[in-house]
Design a protein with these regions (language model features):
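Well-ordered mid-protein domain cores that form the structural environment of catalytic cofactors
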Residues: 82-178
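Long, internal scaffold/assembly segments composed of regular secondary structure
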Residues: 202-239
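TPR alpha-solenoid repeat register
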Residues: 50-51, 123, 161, 195, ...
Length: 239
């Protein structure tokens, strides 16, 4: 048994867990390197979270053709459920629900994980995307808000949690606070493309178009290339 950089226990070798840590770091940056690092983590059959991350990546693509890839990943698990830690079993339940077409149920399972393990960044990030896909504005805010107490500014990835919270605030029409938190997020990590996305939303929703254009132009090198969100953020820039 090992522990990740946020102190969460999990099965797998220290080397595989280090790969998983790097994969999650790429995930919150929307970087393509997440795919290879997740595969590296999953190459250790005992690192169940690596396999689950691969399943989540397939599911988050929202392509029907990738649902089978997610199912195949779970089918290939060589460790039985009894060999999993409770948090890992909960992730398996969430992924299985999503594969079965119950995205809301998957989101609820991930919410339960986040309540018990608020520093589970994978549960927060994947759950946040489910809230986005399903249009659950309130939980876009509250899923992250409930976990904030467990994080501090000393945590290297705290800024990315702030970026998610900023988007949740914006979707609940709390524009001033959203912009404030979002700006803190992108100041902490210039490549926080989701945080950038949150801030530009606040400008759009308040009709502050010149401010939004200036913001996106000033940070263009941070969001325009090297991430999965660049086309979406380009669309916001065009707006």
């Amino acid at each position: 048994m090992s522990a990740d950089q946020r102190g969460l226990a999990m099965t797998g070798s220290p080397e595989a867990v280090a790969c998983l840590d790097r994969a999650i770091d790429h995930l919150i940056r929307f970087q393509i390197e997440v795919v290879d690092e997740a595969a590296n983590a999953a190459s250790d059959p005992s690192c169940v979270m690596g396999t689950l991350l691969r399943a989540y990546l397939s599911l988050m693509s929202t392509e029907d053709s990738n649902v089978k890839k997610a199912q195949d990943a779970l089918t290939a698990l060589s460790i039985t459920e009894t060999g999993l830690l409770p948090r890992e079993r909960a992730h398996l339940d969430a992924a299985s629900r999503w594969i079965a077409g119950d995205m809301a149920g998957a989101g609820a399972s991930l919410d339960a994980i986040s309540v018990e393990h608020p520093r589970d960044l994978l549960a927060l990030a994947v759950g946040h995307q489910i809230d986005f896909f399903t249009g659950n504005a309130r939980n876009l805010r509250d899923r992250i808000g409930r976990a904030l107490y467990a994080w501090s500014r000393e945590d290297p990835q705290f800024g990315f949690v702030q970026g998610m919270y900023a988007f949740g605030l914006e979707e609940c029409n709390v524009y001033g606070r959203s912009e404030e938190i979002g700006q803190q997020a992108v100041e902490a990590n210039a490549d926080d493309v989701w945080g950038i996305h949150a801030v530009v939303h606040t400008y759009e929703m308040q009709g502050e178009i010149p401010e939004g254009v200036r913001f996106m132009k000033a940070r263009k090198t941070d969001w325009a290339t090297g991430n999965f969100l660049n086309v979406h953020n380009s669309w916001h820039y065009a707006l």
